[in-house]
Amino acid sequence: MKKVFAITLLILSSGIYAQQNIDDLLAAGVEDAERFSTDYLTPATESVIYGINNGWFSHGKGQKQFGFEIGLVANTTFIKSSKKSFEMNVSDYRNIRFSDNSSSKTVATALGNNNPDISVMLTYDDPIFGNQEVEVTLPTGIGSADVNMIPTAFLQVGFSPFKGTQLKARYFPKIAVDDVETGLYGFGLQQEFTAWLPQEKLFPVAVSGLIAYTHLDGSYDFTDEGIVEGENQQIKTNINTVLLELIASTKFKMFNVYGGLGYLSGKSETDLVGSFNVSDGVLFSQTITNPISIEDKVTGMRTTLGANLKLGLFSINADYTIAEFDSASLGLQVSF
């Protein structure tokens, strides 16, 4: 269990230490590894939770009965400076200290960048020589640079079994690129409340409600990277979210503006799974299985403002959402 923190840093660093011998890095254990991994990864998973919930609607008015809508949604989530770093206090860790003996430092999350590099000293128990230390450089962010935005895209379809009621589904196929697999799907229901009014045409705006569920799962298989001996070594992430939204829009034939007030609830689970064979190269060896599991829950309000232009069967919309992670969306739809 003493090598888990070093293993975690190796994986998070995307191969920075691939030329080093993991067996020389006897690290600080599961507790410290999970603590650091949680602070390091949480802003990234939260940004995804907010990002994959955009683009569910482009108007407040429901479709005609038996109407279809097929569209492509592109979204960009913006990253605030406060999400790019966190304060790492050595008092929160059992076997870690900074190389210069600082009590705390501001270090990068997965969305940030350490410039210059920041190192920590990991204390471990050697079976012969007792307590020993090894120096490890903390991982920087994705791509070794600051991340200012995270893009997403998906196909979305809608069907109206009744006037004013629209069933929605969105999908992004699971694609494998360089041992990384990511896929997304979701379902939603949008109901126009003003469609129930006896004189709905006299009402100046359309008001509707939306409930939507989105699931994203991804995995990174690094067994063949040779970071440490073992089998079926992967990082797996599962994200599940629910969105409740109240929507209002104008009801003109070509150009309309719309807005929404929503409540978002999401949960992410990130696991380091597989077997990891670690040793000191001489006497000590140990196999660690599924060492780390990180869970994060998110709730928050959001406000969306946008516009929609309809030209025959086709329409295009753009909107901006203000939330813990702001975002902008662009959609292209065909309705019939």
Predicted regions mapped to residue ranges:
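Outer membrane beta-barrel transmembrane domains
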Residues: 258-336
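Repeated loop/turn-to-beta-strand initiation elements of outer-membrane beta-barrel proteins
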Residues: 79, 164-167, 196-199, 254-257, ...
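Transmembrane beta-strands of outer-membrane beta-barrel pores
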Residues: 74-78, 171-175, 193, 211-217, ...
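Extracellular/periplasm-exposed beta-strand and loop segments of Gram-negative cell-envelope proteins
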Residues: 83-85, 131-147, 176-182, 214-241, ...
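Residues on the lipid-exposed face of transmembrane beta-strands in outer-membrane beta-barrel proteins
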Residues: 59, 70-72, 155-161, 187-193, ...
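N-terminal, post-signal peptide beta-strand-biased segments of exported outer-membrane/organellar beta-barrel
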Residues: 18-104
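Residues that define the transmembrane beta-barrel architecture of outer-membrane proteins
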Residues: 64-66, 148-153, 181-187, 203, ...
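Short loop/turn motifs that connect adjacent beta-strands in outer-membrane beta-barrel proteins
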Residues: 58-66, 79-81, 194-207, 253-254
